[in-house]
C-alpha cells in the first residue's frame, strides 16, 4: 500500500456542491473523497483513451479497485457565494435554441477559497503507478476549478505510520476513526461505486472537518491509523 501527499496551487475558487441540492446551495469546504478520485481519474483515463461512461457509471469508478482512501485539507478556508453567467441552451426546448437572448442566464453558486491558495490532497492506493497520475491533475471539482501540482511525496504506507494517539490535522477525518475538537461535522459521499452512478440516494459518511480557522485536535480511535508525512498528520481507516 502506498500514500501520496500532494500540494496544489489553486487558481480559482473550488465549487463542489452537496448531492441533490441546487447550484445556489453552499459548497463543501473541502473536496469530498469522490471528487478527489474523479480528479485523479481524469488524467488516468485520458491516458487509457477510456470511454465517457462505464456500464452506467462514471469511468472514475475503475479507480475504486486500487484507491483505498482520499482526503483533503487546507490551513484555512472561507465559504462564500458568487454570481456567475451560465449557458442554458442545452437545458431548453429546441424551439428556444435559435434565440440568442435565451442563451445565457445568471445563477448564484457556492464556493470555497483557501489560505494562500493552497490545497493538500492525500491518496492511499495499492497501485504505485496510479499515484503517478497525480502529476496530471489540473482541476478539482468543476472544469473551471483549476489547480496545479506544486509538490508531491509518495511513500510506502508502512514507512509513514505513526504510533501517536493525539494529533493535530488540517485534513477532514471520518468520525468513525477519531474524535476531534475545533471541528464541524459534515456528511460527504464515500468511495462506493454507487456514488459514481446517477443515484438519487448517495451513500454518505460523516466527517470531522476543520472549522476553517485552525487545525483540528483529534484522538485516534481503534479503527484508525495515523500517517505522518512531510510534517502533516492525517488519520486514515485501518486496512
Which residue stretches match the model-derived regions?
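N-terminal ordered "arm"
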Residues: 1-53
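Structural preference for beta-rich elements and adjacent junctions enriched in aromatics
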Residues: 22-29, 56-57, 85-92
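Charged/polar, solvent-exposed surface patches and flexible loops
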Residues: 42, 59-62, 136
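Short, glycine/acidic-rich hinge or "gate" loops at secondary-structure transitions
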Residues: 51-66
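Internal, well-folded beta-alpha domain core
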Residues: 64-239
